Amino acid sequence: MTAAVKWAVSHRTIWRHLFPIQNGAISSACHKSTYSSLPDDYNCKVELALTSDGRTIVCYHPSVDVPYEHTKPIPHPDLLHNNEETHEQILRTKLEGNHKHLEQGPMIEQLSKVFFTTKHRWYPHGQYHRCRKKLNPPKDR
């Protein structure tokens, strides 16, 4: 109970500091406050305002433009003289090392890991399913 009273009193003093009330009315229809807990060099300037009816607090914080001199260009890697391995080079070396798997095809476990599927999807259908498949299905109307 006392904590709630202290909380209400502290918030009431903050409201009075931000938006002074004189004779039951707000001194300014749209009183602004530039109070900010952010550091001065932060890329945002916060402004608080109270609407004319006194029920809504409006917070406006536009981002500050950064001068061009303070920016850096995005480094683009040189693809011709790049010594780092690219994704394609890594895949090529893995596939070149596994000539056995290329001749008979990748194994079912590898296929399920590459395509994020279950292992059952890569097994062939049996004779029971193949003989019941309609070879000449009827055409749609």
Swiss-Prot record:
It comes from the Eukaryota. It is found in: Mitochondrion. Pfam families: MRP-S32 (PF10210). GO terms for cellular component: mitochondrial large ribosomal subunit; mitochondrial small ribosomal subunit. Residues 1-31 form a transit peptide. Keywords: Mitochondrion, Ribonucleoprotein, Ribosomal protein, Transit peptide. InterPro entries: Ribosomal_mL42. Belongs to the mitochondrion-specific ribosomal protein mL42 family. Component of the mitochondrial ribosome large subunit (39S) which comprises a 16S rRNA and about 50 distinct proteins. Component of the mitochondrial ribosome small subunit (28S) which comprises a 12S rRNA and about 30 distinct proteins. PANTHER family: LARGE RIBOSOMAL SUBUNIT PROTEIN ML42, MITOCHONDRIAL 39S RIBOSOMAL PROTEIN L42. This is Large ribosomal subunit protein mL42. The gene is Mrpl42.
